[in-house]
Amino acid sequence: MSNIGKVVQVIGPVVDIKFDEENLPDIYNAISIESGNAKIITEVAQHLGDDIVRTISMESTDGLMRGMDALDIGAPISVPVGKPVLGRLFNMLGQPIDENGEVEADEYSPIHRPAPSFEDQSVKPEMFETGIKVIDLIAPYQKGGKIGLFGGAGVGKTVIIQELINNIAKEHGGLSVFTGVGERTREGNDLYYEMQESGVINKTALVFGQMNEPPGARMRVALTGLTMAEHFRDEGQDVLLFIDNIFRFTQAGSEVSALLGRIPSAVGYQPTLATEMGSLQERITSTKHGSITSVQAVYVPADDLTDPAPATTFTHLDATTVLSRSISEIGIYPAVDPLASTSRILDPRVVGEEHYKVASDVKHILERYSELQDIIAILGVDELSEEDRLVVIRARRIQRFLSQPFSVAEQFTGYEGKYVPIKETIRGFKEILEGKYDDLPETAFLFKGSIDEVIESAKNMVKS
């Protein structure tokens, strides 16, 4: 029998509904309210007493009035999952917004579900090969790990995201879910068309809750994307989950918390900040079936890393990839800062002794080169000691060899994209560190894949 209540109060995105005493809907249940031709979905957030439940709307509440009928759906919001979602664009409710017709999905999953049990989780740390040299060498990603992607506007966050989607699709046969949380509509639009042009759209599901949507939708859209990713993982796939931007998830939660009348905590954030973040992040993990590796763009308010929002996010991250404007300004892409980026699995017990030693030596040389920059600027390279001059020669070659042509940027750069296996990456940097290529011109190292391409390019330069 259907359970119908009446709307008794509407305050912005908050809708209070009265039900019969014995039929109160559960917390997180979806409620459907018909307003004219539209159907508005809200989610139960609180039981207030007097048989009234307080719900948060996932859509605009324009047109809602007291006395309207509200139907308890009897379960949380459910979204389509499985193969039919690939290549499609969804809103937070799992409704397609790409004007390509209905999604013919056989399965739907609730967006609220517990994290995998300890017995199901995979505990063996394993490296996830991205084919991007600077990431694989300096700050490797863990399979089933969580990675923070830090960077300002225009330094290449989106290009790295697209290349990762491209590489996991082509090299690993894996799938991706991109979740835009509180993003600018224009950026989501650009990403959708760029993905269509680069051909990676068919291995990707996109979910957007844009900036102009109510806080309920922006708070829950990350769960919609995660639910789609979890289904692929449980089918034995390795999935990439992109969340852009994880700060907007916290921000939307703060708005919802204030609307529900909770007393704010530090810096005005919700008192449940750590719980909300934990309930999302704990579901992003590897199981014995497959893995979800999550790359999350992190906005840092006023560049204050101690702000509760980024500080709470950091506790969950396994690796950080920091994009630097100063590196992009000298024309080296991807503009990843090798000295600021970190990874928990850059450990000889996980990546092996050789990888660890090469990565440490590369960092050491780049750090020394960074220290020498002021001396070089004032006195020039000729005034340096023989040892420091060698550091400069190798550091400049390493810096350029950390650049790489991307498949998704071929139309802009004119270079064919390269996927570099980790063994090739380690071999290349090891040989540069040993001084084998001190006599090759620096420009031969720029935008190359493996070290063999560098040698070939240098030979061609000599011939011409």
UniProtKB/Swiss-Prot annotation:
ATP binds at residues 151-158. SMART domains: AAA (SM00382). Its EC number is 7.1.2.2. It is a peripheral membrane protein. Keywords: ATP synthesis, ATP-binding, Cell membrane, CF(1), Hydrogen ion transport, Ion transport, Membrane, Nucleotide-binding, Translocase, Transport. One of its GO terms (molecular function) is ATP hydrolysis activity. One of its GO terms (cellular component) is plasma membrane. CDD domains: ATP-synt_F1_beta_C, ATP-synt_F1_beta_N, F1-ATPase_beta_CD. Produces ATP from ADP in the presence of a proton gradient across the membrane. The catalytic sites are hosted primarily by the beta subunits. NCBIfam families: atpD. This is ATP synthase subunit beta. It comes from Clostridium kluyveri (strain ATCC 8527 / DSM 555 / NBRC 12016 / NCIMB 10680 / K1). The lineage of its organism: Bacteria, Bacillati, Bacillota, Clostridia, Eubacteriales. The gene is atpD.
